Design a protein with these regions (language model features):
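Acidic Gly/Asp/Thr-rich repetitive segments characteristic of extracellular carbohydrate-active
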Residues: 15-42
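Functionally critical loop-and-helix segments that line ligand-binding/catalytic clefts
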Residues: 130, 155-157, 165, 173, ...
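Extracellular beta-strand-rich solenoid/capping regions of secreted or surface-exposed proteins
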Residues: 40-53, 60-104, 116-123, 172
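Bacterial N-terminal signal peptides
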Residues: 4-14
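Extracellular beta-strand/beta-solenoid scaffold signature
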Residues: 62-70, 90-98, 113-116, 120, ...
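Surface-exposed loop/turn motifs in large extracellular/passenger domains
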Residues: 70-80, 97-107, 120-140, 161-162, ...
Length: 438
């Protein structure tokens, strides 16, 4: 009797899987299919515009091979589902949800135990809203083997899936006009990956415990608003792109020997505004970047606040706060003189400044010179960092702020802000509003 029961259970499970695909195949365009609580075995392929809506506890579970849900049609919606157990082949781009249809709407789902979470390929108008994506961190006996590295033994294998063998939370390739809002992504390789993807909006997402929170290349005219990138190897790496708006984001607690809050590499004509860049190994890094506007950011409590690489010019810094960074600026000996540190007479706040403001306008009457005397040595000999707060270096900084010392790498802010600048600006705005009301 026990054997018969097992056989009947297997037959019932098989029928359930067939029923799900049959429901999809027999549905009319624009139909809504409601999935009851329980496991609905995948994989499934959607080739017509329909909605799949899950009741609480509804799950589409793959068989550990390939994609779990493949969306080929335009105008498909997946909502309220748990989707799990894709394959693990990076060469095949296995994913919980693989999308090649335009205007897909993926909302309020939980994605787990898969290689890539959501993979979008050559699509436009996708909406990825309020999902939780949990990367696969361990191997199990039931899944297909990961592609073997040359020379790797299969005996006594650690079941941990290291980060570079995981997939990305949301992966976009050659897409346009995506909206990615309110998602939480954790334990993947990279949180959100952009490649050749333009005109998208990424807002209010939380990405933590991944390699790069945002890994971004060759993608233009995208907007990033109010996202949090925390406790990753790097908060965001933005490379080879232009025309971006990065506003109101938090890049925090990204720690490690080579951890960054935000890396800008070969990216031009963009705006970085009102971001919090705090408690990272390196807060903000610029390399070969030109004509960017960096306004109103808080760069605080980093080991290095702002690192300049080579060939960056025409960047404009104003109303930023550099506070409690062990090394506010690192230039590595690069010439940074072609960048501007004050716009229309308004510079940046440096917490090391002696404040002299005789006319009470919130602008320091003395210029700020930020000295970077040991950065080259510090990279080759990290122990040099122990000298950062030594009396000799403090004396050197003090002397450099009073007169330029030839041969030392430094930046000069001609109009540094005092701690009262923002209060004075708020008072002026309030008076202007009252006057306008009259």
């Amino acid at each position: 009797m026990r054997i018969i029961g097992i056989v009947l259970l297997c037959l019932a499970t098989s029928a359930m899987a067939a029923t799900l695909q049959e429901q999809i195949d027999s549905a009319a365009p624009n139909d809504t299919i409601h999935l009851e609580a329980g496991v609905h075995p995948g994989p499934v392929v959607i080739s017509k515009p329909i909605k799949l809506v899950g009741e609480s506890g509804a799950e589409i579970r793959g068989n550990g091979s390939g994609n779990v849900v493949t969306i080929k049609a335009d105008d498909v919606t997946l909502s309220g589902l748990r989707i799990s157990a894709s394959g693990l082949r990076l060469s095949d781009d296995d994913a919980a949800i693989f999308i090649t249809g335009n205007r897909a709407r993926i909302e309020h789902n939980v994605i787990a135990d898969s290689l890539h979470g959501i993979y979008l390929k050559k699509v436009s108008g996708a909406q990825i809203l309020h999902n939780r994506i949990e990367g696969k961190t361990t191997l199990s006996v039931s899944t297909e083997p990961v592609e073997k590295t040359i020379g790797q033994s299969t005996e006594n294998c650690d079941t941990t899936l290291v980060s570079n063998r995981r997939g990305n939370g949301i992966h976009q390739w050659n897409c346009d006009g995506s909206t990615i809002v309110g998602n939480e992504i954790t334990e993947t390789r990279d949180g959100i990956y952009f490649s050749f993807t333009n005109n998208s909006r990424v807002e209010d997402n939380l990405i933590h415990h991944v390699r790069y929170g945002l890994h971004y290349m060759y993608s233009d005219n995208n907007v990033f608003l109010n996202n949090t990138f925390a406790e990753n190897a790097a908060g965001a790496a933005i490379m080879f792109s232009k025309g971006l708006v990065v506003r109101g984001n938090r890049f925090i607690n990204n720690r490690g020997h080579r951890a960054y809050g935000l890396i800008f590499q070969s990216s031009d004509g963009s705006k970085l505004e009102q971001n919090e860049i705090s408690a990272n190994a390196v807060g903000l890094s610029f390399n070969q970047c030109n004509d960017n506007e960096i306004t109103g950011n808080r760069v605080t409590q980093n080991y290095i606040g702002l690192r300049f690489g080579s060939n960056s010019s025409g960047n404009r810094f104003t109303e930023n706060s550099f506070m409690r960074n062990l090394h506010p600026i690192e230039t590595g000996g690069s010439d940074v003189s072609e960048n501007r540190w004050a716009i229309n007479g308004v510079g940046n706040f440096w917490d090391t400044d002696l404040e002299v403001d005789l006319d009470h306008n919130g602008i320091n009457d003395l210029p700020h010179r930020e000295l970077d005397s040991l950065s080259v040595l510090r990279r080759d000999f990290p122990v040099i960092a122990f000298l950062s707060e030594s009396p000799a270096l403090k004396l050197l900084r003090f002397a450099n702020e009073r007169a330029v010392i030839p041969g030392l790498s430094a930046i000069e802010d001609p109009a540094p802000l005092t701690s009262r600048f923002w209060k004075i600006q708020a008072q002026r705005s309030a008076r202007a509003a009252v006057a306008k009301g009259k």
